[in-house]
């Protein structure tokens, strides 16, 4: 797969995979944040992703991350919306979680 080099290319690559991601992994929602959204990514940047799942994945979460890395041709940093919400309950992490939430670009 061609390595996406812009925000739009990352979003398009993920959008093209949405039906499969929903069927295989139960992804209901996926969003990008971080350097690709800010426009500060480099050739070596990973892609920061957050997903909402319809079911727990357990160890299959690793398979999801690996699949997304194949699709994007880059390492991914994968989190869930559930984790983001839990982070907001920790005063030390709330500011970062709020910043991530404000910057999300949904697929």
Q: What residue ranges belong to the model's regions?
A:
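Short beta-strand->loop micro-motif that forms the acidic, two-metal-ion catalytic signature
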Residues: 48-51
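Catalytic core of pol beta-like nucleotidyltransferases
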Residues: 1-28, 38-39, 43, 54-107
């Amino acid at each position: 797969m061609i390595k996406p080099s812009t925000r739009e290319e990352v979003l398009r690559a993920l959008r093209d995979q949405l039906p499969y991601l929903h069927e295989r992994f139960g992804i209901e929602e996926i969003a990008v944040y971080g350097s690709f959204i800010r426009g500060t990514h480099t050739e070596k940047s990973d892609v920061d992703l957050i997903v909402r799942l319809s079911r727990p994945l357990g160890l299959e979460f690793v398979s999801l991350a690996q699949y997304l890395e194949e699709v994007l041709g880059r390492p991914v940093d994968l989190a869930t919306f559930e984790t983001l919400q839990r982070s907001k309950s920790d005063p030390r992490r709330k500011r970062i979680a709020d910043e991530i939430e404000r910057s999300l670009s949904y697929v």
